[in-house]
């Protein structure tokens, strides 16, 4: 592993935190203001609900074939280059969305999103390689909070621009494009190259297929990816339709964004709570906190379908964001501590493979369910997360040391090894 001496884990974490924050800010604005943008380019209001779900699936579908390739390219050649690539493509995506004048142009912009993804797992792998083991839970918790904080800031800033400055949503995405260019410059100047403990050799395709096969060979990884994938299906159902729920509860039209801004602030508050999950997991264990966070997420989705006002919706959604962020941090920490070094980097690079499947499946299910009523989407999302909860409990009981016949006192004191 080669790390620039002047850049310890604190500085690398800070740079990657900013990178993830800005990406979350821009992506959240696509989720929050996609209804606005659709109406601005001429889509009838009656068609917006179905198109939101279909475009949400398109968001991830285009990038699915590249998932294993980004990680292989990063480990074989340069993690830094792959991360900078993501920021530059973000700038192009947000620029196209900002400049769109017709629905087909907006569709093209959404297709390009698939080429910007694939950086989060690479950043997590680099953080894992430079962070001391006893600070890993905290580091992963802090990093996991960056994207949700961006997700909260994006709608808040965008709502201010649209309602107070009377700008179109195109200007919102133009600012996101400029911020992404700034991130690319920041990484190029300020970040060092962190090489994996084991640098892969061989052809790109062989390594990519090998990384995917490696996931299937490890029971812990299989369980975690299934659990995470089911959580993401429910999460993406709710996230894709959150803006529409806000407008429904607040009884506002799609061209008004004032109610979306406070939801963004709720996301910020929820994300700010999430590092506490990392701290608690260092004390109690990753498995326990994972199960608790998934249970909390299912309850919040039910509550979101029942709340009578935007204020209560803000509160509940903030709690949902905290739970979602903690789930991600716990999955990352379990993979970082329990996967062997020779496969750890490849596994972390693929950590958002479940996000792609959830991102395709969740909005597609939502597009089918929304015909029965908007709140039905959130009830179904809660049911999906409840399935993930059952799987998480089974994972915790079947993959821990006690389930494998290993005495607890014979193991080093690692929180991830404690079972329910």
Task: Give the role of each language-model region.
Residues 1-9, 194-225, 408-420:
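Juxtamembrane intracellular "pre-TM" segments in multi-pass secondary transporters
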Residues 33-49, 241-257:
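Short amphipathic helix-loop junctions that connect adjacent transmembrane helices
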Residues 93, 104-118, 312-326:
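Hydrophobic core of transmembrane alpha-helices in multi-pass small-molecule transporters
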Residues 109-147:
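Cytoplasmic helix-loop-helix junction between adjacent transmembrane helices
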Residues 170-188, 377-394:
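Symmetry-related core transmembrane helices of the 12-TM Major Facilitator Superfamily/SLC fold
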Residues 287-331:
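C-terminal transmembrane helical hairpin of 12-TM major facilitator-type secondary transporters
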């Amino acid at each position: 592993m080669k790390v620039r001496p002047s850049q310890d884990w604190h500085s690398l974490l800070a740079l990657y935190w900013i990178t993830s924050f800005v990406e979350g800010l821009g992506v959240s604005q696509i989720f929050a203001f996609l209804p606005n943008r659709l109406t601005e380019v001429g889509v009838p209001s009656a068609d917006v609900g179905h198109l939101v779900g279909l475009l949400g699936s398109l968001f991830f579908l285009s990038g699915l074939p590249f998932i294993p390739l980004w990680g292989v390219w990063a480990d074989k050649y340069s993690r830094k280059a792959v991360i900078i690539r993501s920021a530059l493509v973000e700038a192009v995506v947000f620029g196209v969305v900002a400049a769109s004048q017709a629905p087909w142009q907006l569709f093209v912009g959404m297709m390009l999103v698939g080429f910007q993804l694939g950086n989060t797992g690479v950043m997590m792998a680099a953080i894992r390689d430079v962070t001391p083991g006893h600070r890993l839970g905290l580091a992963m918790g802090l990093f996991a909070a960056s994207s949700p904080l961006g997700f909260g800031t994006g709608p808040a800033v965008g709502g201010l621009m649209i309602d107070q400055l009377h700008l179109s949503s195109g200007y919102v995405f133009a600012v996101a494009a400029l911020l992404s260019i700034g991130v690319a410059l920041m990484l190029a100047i300020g970040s060092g190259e962190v090489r994996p403990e084991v640098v892969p050799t061989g052809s790109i395709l062989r390594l990519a297929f090998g990384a995917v096969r490696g996931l299937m060979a490890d029971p812990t990884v299989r369980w975690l990816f299934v659990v995470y994938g089911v959580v993401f299906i429910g999460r993406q159902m709710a996230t894709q339709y959150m803006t529409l729920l806000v407008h429904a509860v607040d009884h506002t039209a799609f061209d008004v964004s004032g109610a979306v801004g406070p939801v963004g602030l709720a996301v910020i508050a929820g994300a700010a709570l999430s590092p506490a999950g990392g701290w608690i997991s260092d004390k109690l264990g990753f498995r326990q906190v994972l199960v608790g966070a998934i249970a909390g997420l299912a309850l919040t989705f039910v509550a979101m379908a029942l709340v009578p006002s935007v204020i209560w919706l803000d509160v509940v959604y903030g709690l949902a964001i905290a739970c979602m962020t903690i789930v991600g941090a716990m999955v990352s920490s379990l993979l970082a501590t329990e996967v062997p070094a020779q496969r750890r980097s490849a596994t972390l690079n693929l950590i958002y493979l479940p996000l792609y499947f959830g991102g395709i499946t969740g909005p597609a299910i939502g597009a089918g369910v929304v015909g029965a009523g908007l709140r039905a989407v959130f009830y179904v999302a809660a049911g999906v997360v409840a399935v993930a909860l059952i799987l998480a409990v089974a994972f915790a009981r079947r993959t821990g040391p006690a389930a494998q016949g290993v005495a607890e006192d014979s193991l080093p004191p690692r929180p991830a090894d404690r079972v329910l």
